[in-house]
Design a protein with these regions (language model features):
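Bacterial N-terminal signal peptides
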Residues: 7-17
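A mature extracytoplasmic/lumenal domain signature
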Residues: 53, 63-64, 111-113, 127, ...
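Short, low-complexity N-terminal intrinsically disordered segments enriched in polar/charged residues
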Residues: 17-51, 159-162
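Hydrophobic pocket/interface hotspot
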Residues: 37, 49, 57, 109, ...
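Surface-exposed, charged secondary-structure patches
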Residues: 58, 71-118
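Short beta-strand edge/turn micro-motifs at domain boundaries
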Residues: 108, 124-151
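Sec-dependent signal peptide recognition
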Residues: 2-9, 131
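Short, solvent-exposed secondary-structure junction/capping segments
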Residues: 35-39, 53-67
Length: 162
């Protein structure tokens, strides 16, 4: 009786631990895709950005106007690539405390972020990326974010490195 119980517990543990391992591998792959997005912006690498975005995506940023109404900026795929890889200013975006939800071949990445331009703090907000798994890798199907300039929390990542 004890032997059967031990074997049953071991089988159950293996089933749950392998599912947990798969979920963790998916989480890491999603985080890697988001980090590639940030790297593409920082290095102005349009090719890298194109390799992780789904063509035809619609992307939206939201910032608050003086009257308290939201200002929504919509960018299609081509405009997003052009705007985010335009040469000129050094930019750095960092996210932390991410929440990742995965169901089958779709996922959501949600995290607070800060954004720096030419080494100086510019704004903060929340990033929301919707991703799909192509069978080979996770791709961003939509990027939406808030853009806030006031009441930004201190990043737990510390100061940016130059």
């Amino acid at each position: 009786m004890t032997y059967i119980r031990v074997v049953s517990i071991a089988i159950i543990w293996l089933l749950f631990s392998s599912t947990g391992l798969a979920d963790e591998q998916q989480r890491r792959a999603i985080i890697e895709t988001v980090n590639q997005f940030f790297l593409a912006i920082e290095t102005k690498d349009a090719e890298l950005l194109e390799s992780i975005l789904i063509p035809g995506s619609l992307n939206i940023s939201s910032s608050e106007q003086l009257e308290g109404k939201p200002e929504l900026t919509k960018m299609d795929y081509e405009r997003m690539i052009s705007a985010l890889t335009r040469p000129g200013r050094d930019t750095k975006e960092r996210a932390w405390d991410e929440t990742i939800l995965i169901q089958g071949h779709i996922a959501i990445f949600w995290a607070p972020y800060d954004f720096h331009v030419d080494g100086k703090f510019s704004h903060c907000g929340v990033d929301s990326f919707q991703l799909v798994n192509s069978g080979e890798k996770w791709l961003i199907s939509n990027a939406s974010w808030t853009r806030e300039t006031q009441d930004c929390p201190q990043s737990p990542l510390g100061p940016i490195s130059q």
